[in-house]
A protein has these predicted regions:
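Cleavable N-terminal targeting peptides that direct proteins into the secretory/outer-membrane pathway or into
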Residues: 1-22
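Short acidic-glycine motifs
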Residues: 21-41, 46, 50-821
Length: 821
């Protein structure tokens, strides 16, 4: 094992990467033959794009093959082929998509035939060398298809086997929603803390729709170049300038008249939304230096339709029910003044600014440089809650002001040492700061910042229980290098990808205290009698400790892969990737459980991958693939292991107001002699390993017409070593108790016997729960995906897809979701 790792490291260090289509780029390749089908070595091939100033001069090898890797995705490519004794071949107006290996089968006629071959658009609808399951959402689709809010990553849902997960708009690939990778021009912009796209789902959009040229969605079996994702990959390419100046301006407007009423709202709340921006791109120096710039703003006002629908506690007019003696009329009237703010339209806005800039410099044919920067600032008053209508009181009682700041930059250098070698180096910088705070405009005198529940009605406090918080402030630096080398029938690739992510979190739920009152009368007395020290609450909770924590994860990735053209009809893509994440270790531990001081980093993360593409007759293709894909460690997991050790943070839980040290409403405890019997300790299993998935595909693709294709795919996914939580503090079960089962009329119709669980039987009575995070979760996913694509021609383009899927899992999602195991 160590020898294999050493070999990978040495090869990566010496030659960095051999490649076909590097992330954020595409490639053009082909084989040149004569009329009899024999290959033609030594033919001169020129790949060019006049608008981008790109020229690549190549020579076919002994197998008649040529490859031009690391090309900028764009329209307008041309390929010319010259060989002594043969007529020139010329293909024009080729469109190269991100992640695509545009393969051309070129036949040359003898020189006696004076006709020049010219192809206006030779892009095949069946890609003969492709082995993954992917789709490109192109420039025309992005520009022409309608989209709500101009959030461009919503187009990902046009891909088979991809769907929304939950209520927040996360993307689920093959049933996996928590381990996807999001790349912009090859640089990782995934927020590692939650394993979601930068800015998450609260923002309007991470990138302006007008700044995106296209993106590739890899839903299954990507090559070894891609890592840190056991789900899917979204590979976005931004727009660049060219030799012609192009610009645009836009303004979009929406209001209540144009919006339908929410089905759960009692009225259609007012909304006014403006989105405006501009884009411009062109040359600074023709064929050498190009620029592109985009700016966009959003101003949105969309109040929340708020109410409290709990008739046993609050009447429709907004008054407490059941307040009486021993509370005085004045005390009952005092708490009634709290409620009107929960009814009606709660002000809410969402304002965002986006700026994007890019420079591309090609000083020579063999060197090109690119630099880009993206700026996002999002601020939303009362924007933690995003629903149009809320009837639980959470529009105030579990809400607050939200802000998101995302910055990311990229530098890349592509060099061509020879006609068969291309090297691409990139540096990425990424920050994502998400902060929430109380809204002072909805504060009520006498409540403070406590969490409040009265007679079962929650969300009566001043805001969400965790406010204020920074969750997280993430910063990442990334270095990656890829070098492509064509040797005979092999297009090989090795690479290295190093990233260091630092998360700062300031977050501790219920640190201001949480009061629960059993009835309205008790709350009315305490609300007006706090100066006299009244304590009539039913229970009280508060988290004590340190709210902030800093986590640094250093990810290392190395890979080797090869695209082998075995025959003109058979292509093999095979490779291996190794990943290692150096995890931070807790500085504060629980002496009762030394396990709280260590988090194991999985080291056996070798991931072999194999893909096969076989062309039956040029119009029918069979693909198959299999591979292992490791997930990245989320900051949510590490934060929980750092803070939930009963020392870093601990929770006081008082079940009676008779405690002398109990607080007087709305005060909180400043210090406490914590009784450990009410706390939880959590740690990682000593043999914790990296979760991964096994992915397999089998697909049949058929070209039905010149611009019409049909694909039928079987997708298989097995999640292995997923993270779950097991309580080690469960002791022996108590005596068996028999319960009688009655029907609606009270007649006994059966019995049910079950053993009892007694808290007194805990293994360690000092703690309520002792949780161990371990690899105990597995999942299975099987799907049949059918897609028909009509490529743009004669003013029409269409794509129709249907996915039938069956998923079985213990519980999927982020580690945060799995805490209930």
């Amino acid at each position: 094992m160590k020898r294999i790792l050493l070999f990978v490291l040495l090869v990566a260090a010496c030659s960095a990467a051999f490649a076909q289509s590097t992330a954020g780029f595409g490639s053009i390749s082909g084989v040149v033959r004569d009329a009899s089908g024999a290959v033609i070595p030594g033919a001169k091939v020129a790949v060019s794009n006049e608008s981008k100033g790109i020229v690549r001069n190549l020579i076919t090898n002994d197998a008649g093959l040529f490859t031009a890797p690391a090309l900028v995705p764009a329209q307008g490519y041309a390929v010319t082929v010259d060989a002594e004794g043969f007529t020139r071949y010329e293909a024009k107006s080729l469109e190269l998509l991100v992640g695509q290996d545009l393969n051309l089968n070129i036949g040359l006629s003898v020189a006696a035939a004076t006709v020049q071959v010219e192809v206006t658009t030779a892009t095949p609808i069946v890609e003969e060398t492709k082995t993954d399951v992917s789709q490109v959402i192109g420039e025309q689709q992005i520009a022409e298809l309608p989209i709500n809010g101009r959030r461009v990553d919503s187009f990902v849902l046009l891909t088979p086997a991809v769907t929304n997960d939950g209520t927040y708009g996360n993307l689920s690939f093959r049933g996996m929603a928590a381990s996807n990778a999001f790349l912009v021009d090859g640089v990782d912009t995934t927020q590692q803390f939650f394993n979601e796209n930068a800015g998450r789902t609260r923002i309007a959009s991470q990138l302006s729709q007008d700044a995106v040229q296209e993106f590739q969605v890899v839903s299954s079996n990507p090559t070894a170049e891609y890592g840190r994702a056991s789900g899917g990959i979204v590979n976005t390419v931004t727009r660049s300038g060219g030799n012609d100046v192009h610009g645009s301006g836009y303004w979009f407007f929406r209001n209540r008249t144009l919006n339908a009423q929410d089905r759960y709202a009692t009225f259609n709340p007012p909304e006014v939304r403006h989105q405006a921006g501009f884009s411009i791109g062109g040359p600074v120096k023709k064929d050498k230096l190009f620029y592109f710039f985009n700016g966009e703003i959003q101003r949105r006002n969309f109040p929340i339709a708020s109410s409290i629908n709990r008739p046993a506690v609050i009447d429709p007019s907004g008054h407490f029910i059941g307040c009486g003696a021993p509370a005085t009329p004045a005390q009952c009237a005092a708490i009634d003044r709290l409620l009107p703010r929960y009814f009606g339209a709660i002000p809410r806005n969402a304002n965002q600014e986006l700026l994007f800039g890019k420079l591309d410099w090609r000083p020579t044919e063999r060197h090109s440089f690119s630099a880009s920067f993206n700026f996002l600032h999002f601020l939303s008053m009362n924007g933690i809650q995003t629903s149009a209508a809320i009837n639980t009181g959470a529009a105030i009682g579990s809400n607050g002001n939200a802000s998101v700041r995302v910055r990311n930059g990229r530098l890349s250098w592509t060099s061509i040492p020879s006609n068969t070698v291309v090297n691409e180096f990139r540096f990425g910088w990424f920050t994502d700061r998400q902060a929430d705070d109380f809204n002072p405009d909805v504060q009520t005198a006498g409540l403070g910042y406590v969490v409040l529940s009265v007679a079962g009605q929650s969300y009566l406090g001043a805001g969400a229980s965790y406010l204020p918080r920074v969750n997280p402030n993430e910063r990442r630096f990334q270095f990656a290098d890829n070098l492509s080398w064509t040797l005979g029938k092999h297009a090989m690739k090795f690479g290295v990808d190093i990233a260091s992510s630092r998360d700062y979190i300031y977050n501790m739920s219920e640190r201001h205290g949480s009061y629960v009152y059993g009835n309205v009368t008790a709350f009315a007395q305490d609300f007006s009698d706090n100066a006299a020290g009244g304590k009539r609450w039913q229970s009280y909770r508060q988290t004590l400790g340190t709210p902030d924590v800093t986590l640094t994860i250093r990810d290392h990735g190395f890979y080797a892969q090869d695209q082998y053209r075995v025959t003109p009809r058979l292509t093999l893509n095979y490779g291996v990737r190794y990943e290692y994440a150096a995890l931070p270790q807790p500085a504060i531990t629980n002496p009762d459980y030394p396990q709280t001081g260590r988090i194991a980093s999985g080291k056996r993360n070798f991931a072999p991958r194999l893909g096969i593409a076989f062309s039956i007759n040029g119009k029918t293709l069979v693909r198959a693939g299999y591979g292992l894909y490791h997930a990245r460690y989320s900051g949510v997991l590490l934060q929980s292991l750092f803070t939930n050790n009963a020392v870093y943070q601990s929770q006081v839980s008082l079940t009676s107001s008779n405690y002398a040290a109990g607080p007087v409403f709305p005060n909180r405890l400043e210090a406490s002699n914590l009784a450990r019997g009410g706390t939880t300790v959590e740690f990682a299993a000593p043999d914790l390993r990296t979760p991964y998935t096994q992915q397999g595909t089998l697909a049949l693709e058929r070209q039905l017409a010149a611009n019409l294709g049909l694909t039928v795919s079987y997708l298989w996914n097995r999640g292995v070593q997923g993270l779950g939580v097991r309580d080690l503090n469960i002791g022996p079960l108590g005596p068996v108790v028999t319960y009688r089962i009655a029907d609606a009329g009270g007649n006994i119709v059966g019995a049910y016997a079950s053993p009892t669980y007694l808290l007194a039987n805990r293994v360690d009575r000092r703690y309520t729960r002792i949780l161990q995070v371990e690899n105990g979760v597995n999942s299975y996913y099987n799907a049949l995906a059918v897609q028909m694509r009509k490529r743009y021609s004669k003013g029409f383009q269409a794509s129709v897809a249907y996915t039938w899927a069956h998923a079985i899992d213990y519980k999927q999602g982020t580690y945060q979701d799995n805490l209930g195991f």
